[in-house]
Amino acid sequence: PKPYIMYTDVHGITWNDVRNKPDFGEAWPILAPVLEGADFLVAHNASFDKGVLYGCCEFYGLTPPDLPFRCTVQLARRVLNIRPAHLANVCRVLGLKLNHHEPLSDAQACAQIALAALRAAP
């Protein structure tokens, strides 16, 4: 990782948090097998996350996962009829705990939204 971390004010990740951690190119071979057997990836505002993932893979000369993305913004709007569909509001409406922009909390909330949409889908 490089010492300049964008959006620290949003996600709270600092240089001290990552200075001795692997960069994406080193981490991907460890992370990619976790996706084996997955049918899809889920993200809140999936087009953004897909762009970041594909951009990182391209930068490091890696093959991105060949998986469709499901967007919990769209699921919240279309299946759960929640508006506005930003993460904090969807969590509030569904009664989900959220420490917004803390990566694990955001990921867990996203998974819970996807599960709620699956349960509610006709």
Please give the residue ranges for each predicted region:
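Conserved non-catalytic scaffold segment of RNase H-like nuclease domains
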Residues: P1-D66, N81-P84, A88-H101
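Conserved catalytic/binding loops enriched for acidic/polar residues
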Residues: D106
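Ser/Thr-centric signal marking residues that sit
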Residues: T8, T72, C110
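Conserved beta-strand -> loop -> alpha-helix junction used to position metal-binding or nucleic-acid-contacting
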Residues: T63-A76
